[in-house]
Design a protein with these regions (language model features):
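Bacterial replisome coupling helices
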Residues: 77-174
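Non-catalytic protein-protein interaction segments used by genome-maintenance enzymes to assemble
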Residues: 11-79, 101
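Phenylalanine-focused residue identity feature
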Residues: 2, 59-60, 87
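Non-catalytic, well-ordered alpha-helical scaffold segments
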Residues: 3, 33-41, 62-70, 118, ...
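Charge-patterned, long linear interaction tracts outside catalytic cores
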Residues: 1-15
């Protein structure tokens, strides 16, 4: 009887197929997202970075990042200071809790340097200006009026100058 059970189990064992675990596709973040995550992480750690964000960048075009930034600014205005641990306690009741934790988890090296936040801000500006530049160039192709084309052309030139200044500043640092 033991041998019969043993043989039965072996035959059942051969029928069982290993089910591979579901593939977890890890999405890579683009330069804008990485920069935004770092800026927000810096802001969660010290109000001086909140001030730098407000004066040097002002807003994020992406709603998710803009809402988290506004939440941090609100927290600083209410509490007159910010520390990561206290902000995380506050975030527990925030509707943005998941976004806030996702940002914190994305930071690989949590070193905070003032020069780095400026690099991240410049990345954001450059990307936003490049997107604006594409939009203006597409608009310019559709416009018939010479005066309108000229106005848009000036905006394009101004944006190109701003982008080149940021790229030049970055290449000097490297």
């Amino acid at each position: 009887s033991y041998d019969v059970l043993k043989n039965e189990l072996k035959s059942e064992e051969s029928k069982i197929e290993a089910i591979p675990p579901p593939a977890q596709k890890k999405e890579r973040k683009n330069r804008y997202e990485v920069s935004a995550d770092h800026i927000l992480y810096y802001m969660m750690n010290d109000q001086k970075y909140v001030k730098i964000y407000q004066t040097k960048l002002g807003f994020f075009k992406e709603e998710k990042y803009r809402k988290v930034a506004n939440e941090i600014i609100y927290y600083v205005e209410e509490n007159k200071k910010i520390e990561l641990a206290d902000f995380l306690t506050y975030a527990e009741i925030s509707p943005l809790k998941n976004e806030i934790y996702e940002i914190i988890k994305s930071i690989k090296v949590p070193n905070i340097e003032e020069t780095s936040i400026m690099d991240y801000i410049n990345n954001i500006k450059e990307i936003m200006w490049e997107n604006e530049l594409k939009k203006y160039k597409n608009e310019q192709k559709k416009i018939q009026d010479i005066n309108e084309k000229e106005k848009l052309g000036q905006k394009i030139v101004d944006l190109m100058i701003k982008i080149q200044e940021i790229k030049k500043e970055r290449s000097v640092k490297e």
